[in-house]
């Protein structure tokens, strides 16, 4: 990795990537619509002139810029298409024209949509790369559309692209009112690390590993999440008695929650990042 363009450099992940690359002595250009100390180019993704200028001399692109799930209530579907689909197309086309060696596209486990949600009172779902997405909202729909454009760019004109479907890494509180009312934020995040959350530092290392491997992979897609103590054999019990499974698989965490008098939140899914670890050589903290 010789020179990197990070889109969305004013965001949580984009800033972390720019900080890490800069600290490692890698030349990096940050591009975002919002100014920040980590953003050198303030421009929209669809500003092709600004994008071409930012791509001069760039060998790898880390494309994190996006409208997120919390924006569903404040932005139109067209806004999502403009940023997440048209913006990604612009990044892919201009990257190919600039001779970029590899692009890493930050997708989301939200792309799985309704496939994430088990039947009422049913077992938790096991989520890996074999699960077929079922659309739930415009965020997931535009992420899967952008992923398709990434695969198309890998086929023609042959731009190496790695898609990372990342689980939760944002510091904000859960966006579901009923969940926030039933559980405190610390408890939610601690348990989520067992099945649907990842540290932002590990998301950074996954992007850097993907950038290094992109030229030889051509196109690939991975789930990126923290290692889970849960197993496939736990899924039925996770759906009915997550506290019992937590006590068995993560006894220290179960004891901490019991000591604090905190109930164990529901566990409806388990993300499996094994393929990313095996194929990217991704190491996690």
Question: What kind of region is each of these model predictions?
Answer:
Residues 112-113, 156-180:
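Flexible, glycine-rich beta-alpha linker
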Residues 89-136:
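Conserved Rossmann-fold NAD(P)-dependent oxidoreductase catalytic core, especially the SDR/UDP-sugar
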Residues 82, 118-160, 189:
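Catalytic helix-loop patch of NAD(P)-dependent Rossmann-fold dehydrogenases
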Residues 169-187, 193-222:
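Alpha-helical substrate-binding/gating segment
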Residues 4-24:
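N-terminal Rossmann NAD(P)H-binding glycine-rich loop of SDR-like oxidoreductase domains
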């Amino acid at each position: 990795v010789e020179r990197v363009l990070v889109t969305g450099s004013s965001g949580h992940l984009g800033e972390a990537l720019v900080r890490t690359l800069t600290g490692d002595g890698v030349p990096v250009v940050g591009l975002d619509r919002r100014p920040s100390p980590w953003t050198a180019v303030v421009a929209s993704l669809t500003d092709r002139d600004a994008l071409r200028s930012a791509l001069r001399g760039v060998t790898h692109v880390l494309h994190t810029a996006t409208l997120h799930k919390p924006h569903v209530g404040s932005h139109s579907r067209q806004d999502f298409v403009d940023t997440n689909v048209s913006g990604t197309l612009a990044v892919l086309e201009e990257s190919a024209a600039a001779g970029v060696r590899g692009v890493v596209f930050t997708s989301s486990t939200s792309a799985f949509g309704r496939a994430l949600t088990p039947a009422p009172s049913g077992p938790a779902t096991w989520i890996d790369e074999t699960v077929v997405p079922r659309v739930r909202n415009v965020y997931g729909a535009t992420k899967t559309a952008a992923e398709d454009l990434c695969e198309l760019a890998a086929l023609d004109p042959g731009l190496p692209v790695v898609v990372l479907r990342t689980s939760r890494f944002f510091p904000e509180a859960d966006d579901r009112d009923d969940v926030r009312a039933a559980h405190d934020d610390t408890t939610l995040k601690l348990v989520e690390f067992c099945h649907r959350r990842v540290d932002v530092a590990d998301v950074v290392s996954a992007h850097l590993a993907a950038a290094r491997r992109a030229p030889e992979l051509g196109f690939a897609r991975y789930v990126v999440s923290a290692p889970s103590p849960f197993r496939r054999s736990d899924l039925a019990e996770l759906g009915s008695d997550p506290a019992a499974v937590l006590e068995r698989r993560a006894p220290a965490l179960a004891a901490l929650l019991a000591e604090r008098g905190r109930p164990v939140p529901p566990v409806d899914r388990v993300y499996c990042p094994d393929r990313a670890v095996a194929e990217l050589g991704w190491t996690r903290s």
